[in-house]
Amino acid sequence: MSFPQLGYPQYLTAGQAAVYGGERPGVLAAAAAAAAAAAAAGSGRPTGAELGSSSTAAVTSVLGMYASPYSAPNYSAFLPYTTDLTLFSQMGSQYELKDNPGVHPATFAAHTTPGYYPYGQFQYGDPGRPKNATRESTGTLKAWLNEHRKNPYPTKGEKIMLAIITKMTLTQVSTWFANARRRLKKENKVTWGARSKEDDNIFGSDNEGDHEKNEDDEEIDLESIDIDKIDDNDGEQSNEEEDEKLEHLRQGEKESLKKESEVMIPSSDGLKPKDSMSLGKESSDTSNTRIVSPGGQGNIQVPPHSKPKIWSLAETATSPDGALKSSPPPSQGNHTSPPIQHPAFLPSHGLYTCQIGKFHNWTNGAFLTQSSLINMRSLLGVNPHHAAHHNHHHLQAHQQAPFLATNLSSLSSDKTPERTSPKHSDRENVPRTDSPPQLKPSFQAVRENTLSQQEGTSRILTALPSA
């Protein structure tokens, strides 16, 4: 029996029945029952002789669909449609196999399912799929750009409309317009004004303020746009750091100039302290200045109009020794001294003293020499010539006393310096090692003026320098 609707007009032979009959009895029985029902439906007269032949023919016809590797190992029990062969007789008349397009052979017409053909409408023609920018799609964009050359900034609504027409995405449309604006600027050097506010209020634009930005000459590539932004930011940060460094250097230079200008150079009167003014009678010349040093080194001439040097090694090397030594602690707090300044900060025409703490050190005889003591006043403002004249009156009073009272006169002469200078009474008992050799030549003139023939006067004079 044949099945023309399946396309396999095969007939069962005795040898095939003997081969497949003994191995799968259960499957053959089920297949025989199904084949008998199909034969009864087709002929309408089922007979007992036809039942056996129809069952074997149904199995062999189904197995004929497969090649020899499937039929040789006897996979008939695993075929899915062996028990449902009655369906094919009813479905065969519903399909018109003559109009089959020919992609598949006619033998598979019963098993065909609705499939998508390559390059069809639904698979590759989906409008939601992004499309590459072609000349046809960009032609619409070029036409819009030519119409809006004065203001080539489409609003968001216009971009959506152009994206629908050209089947492109909004990002592609925006990038195309950005590149087109760069090309126009490069070719024609055209600059555009501000956008109209009405379009922005209605639709809004994602390119607001593009005309204010400095656009690069190169076009934007969507793949490397993030990397380009990072590189630009790094370049801007490096430029900003260099600018900040330059600003810090300039500010430091300005501050140093301000500090130099703040170092005030006072006038010669302002530099002269009150104590040094009383000592400066000998400085009659205004061009040259004598620096009085207590170390007995004499007077040092300073050249006029010497420019001050800030922290100069040569200036510190040539400065007096007293300037490098620290001042001794003051014993009396009644007298004040001018503020100590470095010699480099002082002008050339000012009189300044050596850096020895208080003024009472100048009255100490241990630090004075013969040249410096003559022109200086004592702490009480008494000139040495006046002191010699005062001592002369005391000596005349003591000369009237007999020689037996020489000891008493020496005691009275010890009390007179206590009356004139009571603050120096505590210095009589202090031993001085350097004062006797330095004080003898300074009082030599006083001794010659008041010389007498009596021995008591010499004793009185020896007691006077101790005061």
Swiss-Prot record:
Record bears the keyword Membrane: no
Q: List the stretches of this chain annotated as a DNA-binding region.
A: 126-188
Single GO biological process annotation from the record:
positive regulation of transcription by RNA polymerase II
Keyword vocabulary terms for this entry: Activator, Developmental protein, Differentiation, DNA-binding, Homeobox, Neurogenesis, Nucleus, Repressor, Transcription, Transcription regulation
The residue ranges flagged as biased composition, category Acidic residues, are 215-225, 233-244
Q: Which SMART domains match?
A: HOX, IRO
Main localization is nucleus
Entry keyword Nucleus: yes
Q: Where is the composition biased (Polar residues)?
A: 447-460
Cellular compartments annotated? Nucleus
Q: Where is this region: Disordered?
A: 197-306, 318-344, 410-467
Tissues expressing the protein: Expressed early in neural differentiation in the neural plate, and expression continues in the neural tube after neural fold closure. Expressed in the presumptive midbrain territory. Also expressed in the prospective neural crest and the preplacodal field, anterior to the neural plate. Strongly expressed in the profundal placode and weakly expressed in the trigeminal placode.
Q: Might you report a single GO cellular component term? A: nucleus
SUPFAM superfamilies, per database record: Homeodomain-like
What's the name of the protein? Iroquois-class homeodomain protein irx-1-A
